[in-house]
From Swiss-Prot:
Family: Belongs to the uracil-DNA glycosylase (UDG) superfamily. Type 4 (UDGa) family.
Activity regulation details: Product-inhibited by both uracil and apurinic/apyrimidinic sites.
Coiled coil start-end: none
pH dependence per the entry: Optimum pH is around 6.2.
Domain remarks: Contains a pseudo-FCL region, a large solvent-exposed peptide region containing an alpha helix and loop anchored on each end via ligation of two cysteine thiolates to a [4Fe-4S](2+) cluster. This region is involved in DNA binding and catalysis, particularly in duplex DNA contexts.
Annotated source species: Archaeoglobus fulgidus (strain ATCC 49558 / DSM 4304 / JCM 9628 / NBRC 100126 / VC-16)
Protein's job: Removes uracil bases that are present in DNA as a result of either deamination of cytosine or misincorporation of dUMP instead of dTMP. Can remove uracil from double-stranded DNA containing either a U/G or U/A base pair as well as from single-stranded DNA.
Entry's EC annotation: 3.2.2.27
Record's protein name: Type-4 uracil-DNA glycosylase
Record-linked Pfam families: UDG (PF03167)
Residues at which [4Fe-4S] cluster binds: 14, 17, 85, 101
Entry keyword Iron-sulfur: yes
Protein keywords: 4Fe-4S, DNA damage, DNA repair, Hydrolase, Iron, Iron-sulfur, Metal-binding
Length: 199
């Protein structure tokens, strides 16, 4: 089986599309290579491009906070994107870019073989749902629902939620977002810390 390190090395010298010409850093992914849960976003933004790590800006801060709310740290999970390079001006990925770069994500998932895959936002959900032959309509329709697929000789849970950037942009989604993370915590056998956990 291919190792995650081998895939990351290949990403770091990728020339499959023109995004490598405009990026500052490749952003392959970060976290635990034996993670039970993988979070998949759309593409690196400005902060991620500068640092070479996914979800390090304001959206990343919210993601880290939500992980902590269910007793997880970034080091416990694996975080990546469909695209490994930033599209100029944060424009939407093109179908060609998704097709060429998406292969890396498929191989990353194959190397990690998680029990839970969380799609952060519409692009990630479209890609993952397509990969697992699940019907995707809109993010608001599939959001928060748990789908079960057979993969790697086991049952894998797939859940789509809003991208953290959408929650920052629309604070009224926050309560719903927290509820979705509780559900993710339950899928991983985690619960929200209570006051008694700190006594």
């Amino acid at each position: 089986m291919e190792s995650l390190d081998d895939i990351v090395r290949e990403i770091m010298s990728c020339r499959k599309c023109d995004l490598h010409k405009t990026k500052t850093n490749y952003v392959p992914g970060v976290g635990n290579e034996k993670a039970e849960i993988v979070f998949v976003g759309e593409a690196p933004g400005r902060d991620e491009d500068l640092k070479g790590e996914p979800f390090v800006g304001a959206a990343g801060k919210l993601l880290t906070e939500m992980l902590a709310s269910i007793g997880l740290r970034r080091e416990d999970v694996y975080i990546t994107n469909v695209l490994k390079c930033r599209p100029p001006n944060n424009r939407d990925p093109t179908p060609e870019e998704v097709e060429k770069c998406g292969d890396y994500l498929v191989r990353q998932l194959e190397a990690i073989r998680p029990n839970v895959i969380v799609c952060l936002g519409r692009f990630a959900a479209q890609f993952i749902f397509n990969l697992f032959d699940l019907e995707f309509t809109t993010i608001s329709r599939v959001k928060g629902k748990v789908y079960e697929v057979e993969r790697w000789g086991k049952k894998v849970k797939v859940i789509a939620i809003y991208h953290p950037a959408a929650v920052l942009y629309r604070p009224q989604l926050r309560e719903e977002y927290e509820s979705d993370f509780k559900k993710i915590g339950e899928l991983c056998g985690k619960k929200q810390p209570t006051l008694f956990d700190y006594l």
